[in-house]
């Protein structure tokens, strides 16, 4: 029997320790340990390989970034109360689900 691969999750900013610990347990997670904002170019490179993108409200997820994503990107799960920083229409056009975390802040 072959082990099932963990989804690749790219997390753009530092999250609470408990969240990052759980992410590492469940996923092949790339964390932003130093909490330095990633440039648009760095984000474009990251979404080429990610199954899930976890941005925060400070990250602009526009149509250009979404178009740079690989076909395996299926979810943008924003660690924020809203999704105003995400081009939801562009994501939906690519079959990417967009969610947020209400009451997280």
What is each residue range found by the language model?
Residues 52-105:
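Phosphate/diphosphate ligand-binding glycine-rich loop within oxidoreductases
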Residues 1-52:
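N-terminal glycine-/charge-rich "phosphate-binding" loop or analogous flexible N-terminal tail
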């Amino acid at each position: 029997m072959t082990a099932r691969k963990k989804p690749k999750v790219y997390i753009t900013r530092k999250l609470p320790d408990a969240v990052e610990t759980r992410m590492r347990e469940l996923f092949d997670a790339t964390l932003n340990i130093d909490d330095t904002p990633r440039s648009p170019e760095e984000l474009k490179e990251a979404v080429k390989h990610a199954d899930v993108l976890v941005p925060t409200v400070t990250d602009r997820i526009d149509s250009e970034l979404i178009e740079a994503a690989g076909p395996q990107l299926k979810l943008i799960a924003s660690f924020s109360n809203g999704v105003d920083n995400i081009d939801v229409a562009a994501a939906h056009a690519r079959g990417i689900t967009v969610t947020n975390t209400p009451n997280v802040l």
